[in-house]
Amino acid sequence: IPSEKFYNRYFGETGWRAMTIRSLSIGQGEILVTPLQLANSMAAIANEGFYVTPHLNKNDTMQKRIHTVKVDKKHFPIVNEGMWRVFEFGTGRRTKIPDVSMCGKTGTVQNNHGKDHSLFVGFAPRENPKIAIAVVVENAGFGATWAAPISSLLMEQYLNGKVARTEMYDHIIMSTTNSDVKKR
């Protein structure tokens, strides 16, 4: 997240104002985050204020440091509710795993150098979360079109040990997000 120091260096001390940074509130502008950082933010929301250092081996206790975020716990329930509604009534409803209460946010990342990127962040299940995820599909357009279904299938595999929604799986596997790519 850019600081005042960053903006003073980038624009000069009198070269920026509130209008310069308003796009930060919707995740645009000079914000640079990795998918791993986005997944960590989902874990922090799912856990109401903490996340564990990402690790490759779940039995590696040396790597499981707990990090807390400086957000008052009273704010998490409303964020959780809003993210749950994405799957119940919003852009994620077509990708909901049956019988799993899910939370997430679809997004479209503007790309000045080509087609927009498809983004999804989320966690499941809503109660007692087991997985937090972030998926970015470059040059693929809307988050609900590509990143949300891919995330949903990955979460389903993780939670259930299999993917039962073969139609969605086949669609993802057999499709391309790049119209320049020819199918064999």
What are these regions (language model features)?
Residues L38, G143-A148, S152-M155:
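Short, charged, low-complexity patches
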Residues M62-H67, I150-R184:
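Short, gly/Ser/Thr-rich active-site loops of penicillin-recognizing serine hydrolases
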Residues K130, F142-A144, G161:
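Intrinsically disordered, low-complexity acidic/polar segments
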Residues I1-A140, T176, V181-R184:
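Beta-lactam-recognizing serine transpeptidase/beta-lactamase-like catalytic domain environment
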